[in-house]
UniProtKB/Swiss-Prot annotation:
This is Myoglobin. It is found in: Cytoplasm, Sarcoplasm. Residues 2-148 form the Globin domain. Belongs to the globin family. It comes from Lycaon pictus (African wild dog).
Length: 154
């Protein structure tokens, strides 16, 4: 289920727009994740106290974590599917330390798509959305395979 060179180029083009404000995009992705799936907030001790969208928007810690999440994802996307080295430590920490179910990775993938649609509607056409969804699915499938290797049933 790999992406063609053309699809990767589309993904990296839109990702270039994300990189102009990783922290802002990341914060928005996490806010959308927590609003759409409040149960995911339970996995984040640092953010459990944030109950409203305004509190989330005002949280520098949430913004920093959003930056961390999207920086890691960007590093993976830039590998165009050859992301074994980047994926292994991420899968390890998310399986053994954070215990993040694959389902939550689907939720955050949806949030990423929604934020891109919202912030970059003029550039986020059907082909862009399809390519990004495919790239995020590849990432999730590869994380799920690593989880299985680690014995995590997430």
């Amino acid at each position: 289920m790999g992406l063609s060179d053309g699809e990767w180029q589309i993904v990296l083009n839109i990702w270039g727009k994300v990189e102009t404000d990783l922290a802002g995009h990341g914060q928005e992705v996490l806010i959308r994740l927590f609003k759409n799936h409040p149960e995911t907030l339970d996995k984040f001790d640092k953010f459990k106290h944030l109950k409203t969208e305004d509190e989330m928007k005002g949280s520098e810690d949430l913004k920093k974590h959003g930056n961390t999440v999207l920086t890691a994802l960007g590093g993976i996307l830039k590998k165009k599917g050859h992301h074994e080295a980047e994926l292994k430590p991420l899968a390890q920490s998310h399986a053994t330390k954070h215990k993040i179910p694959v389902k939550y990775l689907e939720f955050i993938s949806d949030a990423i798509i929604q934020v891109l649609q919202n912030k970059h509607s003029g550039d986020f056409h059907a082909d862009t959305e399809a390519a990004m969804k495919k790239a995020l699915e590849l990432f999730r499938n590869d994380i799920a395979a690593k989880y299985k290797e680690l014995g995590f049933q997430g």
